[in-house]
Amino acid sequence: MSTPSGFIQFNPVQLSATVPENTSPLREACTTLAAYDLHTSYTGTDLIGSNGNVSVRRTSGFVVTATQLPSKHNLAPEDCVHLETCVDGDARFHGAKLPSSESIMHWHLFETFPDIQAIVHVHESNALLYSEPNRTRWAELGIVESAQDIGGGTIEVGRATAEAFTTESSYVILKNHRPDWDPGRTGTVVIHRTLEEAVNSALKIHEALKQ
């Protein structure tokens, strides 16, 4: 199992090829978010993949979507990975595919906020996020932006994202977190105590920004 060069900024260590069980809710959440154009497939690049990822806490570690999935519509069980531990840059996992390139961010958020059970990372339209009328509503909607630019795939991303959460109910914009081939969208993150709440929070902001 090879690591995509420059894409995953940590060392994935496969403990087994066992596919995690009971992932239907997570996979259905991805289908829902993709239907709202929040988990878009890559275009304008030779890379295969789609924006965003979703994770759910388990007794040890968490289950997260795999990396470089062409689409997040109707994912299969093998499109999910159980990340068991993350120590010194080694992400130890069970699954048939490599874990999401943002797994380190998810790990740090779960460690920082022990009460949360789910994390939703989407890429929202810049036209919605940064329009002048909508920027004046950020405080009202609970939207905050990270203080620093946030790239991808490193523990620093996790730390900077965690610091941006003023409350667990915040909707955090990851400043300048956008790939070169998709400059019209920026990554955002919500955390919650249930997967349903996390998905609903992302969709609620999406719909509010369209008003």
Q: What are the residue ranges of the model-derived segments?
A:
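Glycine-rich flexible loops
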Residues: M1-Q211
